[in-house]
Amino acid sequence: MKKILFLFILTISCNVLGEDISDFKIEGMYIGESLLDYYSEEEIFKNKSNASYNLKEAKFYSTTFRNSNFENYEAVEIFLKSNDNNYIIYSIRGGIFYENKIEECKVKKKEILNEMKNFLKMNFVSGELKHQFDETGKSIQYQSYFLFEDNSNIRVECYQWS
């Protein structure tokens, strides 16, 4: 079967807004600040995903923006807490799409991991796993992550969708 899409994703997320993780930004946006600093409520709801996430009993949803003016990513997905009128960012991920070019995705992943490792002065954990949303079991995630003391993390991933 032909491989359809390769996706590079850098995810920054935290369980509790900690000092370590909040220094990182994707396309100028930080965890812990309001998404209203960048987008209107109308734009947030227009781009809202139908999926919701239940992380430690707080319901979250995501909203995704595609902007040709982004410097590093083709799309940014932001996770917000349901019923939060301040629209505080709890997790943010940037994506680059590599159609039928998994090796290019892996090169970009390695480049970012090396930069992050030098900056963070810590090691990362890597592995491959089947993507949970592909019922065929043929799609693979190439995942690496840095785990902080407060259980927040930075993940760098390539998805190979089948």
Model-derived segments and spans:
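Sec-dependent N-terminal signal peptides
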Residues: 3-16
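Hydrophobic pocket/interface hotspot
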Residues: 38, 116
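Long, hydrophobic N-terminal alpha-helical segment
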Residues: 35-37, 44
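Short N-terminal segments immediately surrounding and downstream of signal-peptide cleavage
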Residues: 20-35
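Amphipathic N-proximal alpha-helical interface segments
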Residues: 19-22, 45-111, 115, 124-162
